């Protein structure tokens, strides 16, 4: 009996690149958001803006660890005027830092003052023209809806013109928890209401020939946040809009869960090519947010700002204390930005799973490890010499820099 041989299956070409949504470039000081530029990392100081020295110190701390845009809150005219001193002192004692100011309730006059001193103004459509809730109201007629829309236009127009004429930018920052009453009655407490709220403000800006816009659709629940951003992208695509998106899960909390929650929302969208700037909002010191942002971007291959470590979870085959050795390797090499280094416990899966790494440290037999350059085994050395020999190999290749 002749057995027919099966044809060798053809392996499809898998594209592992994240193809980012095409967006227009929007300037924020010396930084550009969108337009194919790297995803920008930002945060917000928690100092009172009236405390000029404290605010300057807070902005500087964030900027020095990689925060590329820093936001401040401006709840009053006094806070707005303090921004002039903050900006001047930053330039005199440090350097210019791209600044964004948050403006909320009935903020037109404040926003006009703020626009003189910062690079971008963030407004919340649900609060910019504040509507006092009416417990007796059962809805809005078309006329009432339109009248409030006209009031919004009248209030927003001076700010738009000021930003347009200065070449500055605006973030239209919708929050699920602060939709206006008329949007809630008309569209419900839904992603659709969030999208319509943003589109109303975008169209006013476009009618005044102002398109330096960034849009955000934040929510404290990840599924709502994801739905809102995806619907916003769908609507913008239908309308021929290409505004960059600022991603974030608002009020994510603290600790491990706050980081996981933020990552679940932000990384899911980034993996789909959605998002041009990110903030991880934690109930912790703002400085704690920045490493999380860069870790998300590194994990997705969108920005490489640190060493990428590949390490197995350890099992009964592991030939050395994997956790301790990984710590030693990390401490010795963490400054070598751009390298991929693998630490694997045994040769069963080690060489295959670390094939994309620049260097590998693999358990070979009891008391010995093998060092790899890519897929090639270079040498076997005693485990006690492993970390130093790894350093020597990197140095021999000319890829070492002193910390």
Curated annotation (Swiss-Prot):
Binds 1 [4Fe-4S] cluster. It catalyses: (2E)-4-hydroxy-3-methylbut-2-enyl diphosphate + 2 oxidized [2Fe-2S]-[ferredoxin] + H2O = 2-C-methyl-D-erythritol 2,4-cyclic diphosphate + 2 reduced [2Fe-2S]-[ferredoxin] + H(+). GO terms for biological process: isopentenyl diphosphate biosynthetic process, methylerythritol 4-phosphate pathway; terpenoid biosynthetic process. GO terms for molecular function: 4 iron, 4 sulfur cluster binding; 4-hydroxy-3-methylbut-2-en-1-yl diphosphate synthase activity (ferredoxin); iron ion binding. Belongs to the IspG family. Converts 2C-methyl-D-erythritol 2,4-cyclodiphosphate (ME-2,4cPP) into 1-hydroxy-2-methyl-2-(E)-butenyl 4-diphosphate. This is 4-hydroxy-3-methylbut-2-en-1-yl diphosphate synthase (ferredoxin). It comes from Synechocystis sp. (strain ATCC 27184 / PCC 6803 / Kazusa).
